Amino acid sequence: MSLVSNSLALIERGANEILKFDELERRLRSGRPLRIKAGFDPTAPDLHLGHTVLLNKMRQFQELGHQVIFLIGDFTGMIGDPTGKNVTRKPLSHEDVLANARTYEDQVFKVLDRTLTEVRFNSEWFGKMSAVDMIKLAAQHTVARMLERDDFAKRFVSQQPIVIHEFLYPLIQGYDSIALRADVELGGTDQKFNLLMGRALQEHHGQPPQVVLTMPLLEGLDGVAKMSKSLGNYIGIKEPPIDIVTKTMKIGDDLMWRWIELLSFKISAAEVVALREAVAKSELNPREVKLRLAHELVSRFYDNAAAEKAIAGWQAVVTGQGNNNLLPLQKINVPADGVRLVALLTKSGLAPSNSEAMRKLKERAVRVDGIVVDDAHLHFVPGFEGLIQIGKRNFAKVRLVTSSESHDFPESNGIDKS
């Protein structure tokens, strides 16, 4: 297999779509280092595993000798990306955006090679753009074309407001590709419209249009929704190693393969096939595969010693020989009058449904702080903090809070047996 063919195979792994593949192949055959761009709007502090799907692909391009551009959208972050939204996003102040951006700069090199990375801010060019220039940019696209976007179309049909600045967002993101002379732009599948806008604008400005590579959106810990801080189903890349291990070990077996495909550098596609076969034949416990993934993630964000220590700590806890204080604390929002045990088991992610929680209770497989419980009506109120467990290895250390509370709770065991 030729060098270009090997490169294409690596680039294709985990990708959802490449537009246009023949253009990418032609540029790779040119032998020159390509400029690979991906933009990140710092609308919240800190990066999580969902962000690293793109970062991992950028790192693969670096390993092939290409230059990547980690673009911080400090200008676009103040506008707010309307992608996938059914309402207008609340704009952030420039101060908030810059504060969030600083956390990105600190963390991005846990994945990327610093020597092959340009960190850029799109305020570099938009901060100098005049009102006339912005109007000229807006004149390069039509409202009808904008309304072809699924999210805009739905809002238009349902008579939900679309503010004019939201129409500017795809144009502004597209202009970034002109300013950076991007050869390839990476983005999530939900960004395809914006990425194609970059191609169109580059062509309009006499530049070769960029290749668009979309990556799938990583499902969060629940295995259903996109990983998101607002949903609480995420693993932050600067979380303590024991937290990364514990959360990774809780994901479902089906989700495990998805995460390996999108997050692992060390487990090859061929090895995944072999591992899947071994698990299917019950020759290998899925837990061992998750441990490999957890070890790789902690090693990447910290080092090998931290990974070994975290896994040893996790194993000690699950075998009853360790300290529960090592476990991450999961805060769960509940109503002011509390929640019953069945709901707590599902909210914590220990059970996928109320019916499964009930089944485990009937099997006497549920423990609260080490004590077997089978009362589905056991009631927990805000302030409860403890270890809940299903079986030997499925557990969560939780604290119940209400959305309006952020202070410390008065001393209470938090269990209401009435």
From Swiss-Prot:
The gene is tyrS. One of its GO terms (molecular function) is ATP binding. HAMAP family: Tyr_tRNA_synth_type2. Catalyzes the attachment of tyrosine to tRNA(Tyr) in a two-step reaction: tyrosine is first activated by ATP to form Tyr-AMP and then transferred to the acceptor end of tRNA(Tyr). ATP binds at K229. A motif ('HIGH' region) lies at residues 42-51. One of its GO terms (cellular component) is cytosol. This is Tyrosine--tRNA ligase. Homodimer. GO terms for biological process: tyrosyl-tRNA aminoacylation. PANTHER family: TYROSINE--TRNA LIGASE, TYROSYL-TRNA SYNTHETASE. It is found in: Cytoplasm. It catalyses: tRNA(Tyr) + L-tyrosine + ATP = L-tyrosyl-tRNA(Tyr) + AMP + diphosphate + H(+). Its main location: cytoplasm. Residues 339-400 form the S4 RNA-binding domain. It comes from Xylella fastidiosa (strain 9a5c). Keywords: Aminoacyl-tRNA synthetase, ATP-binding, Cytoplasm, Ligase, Nucleotide-binding, Protein biosynthesis, RNA-binding. NCBIfam families: tyrS (TIGR00234).
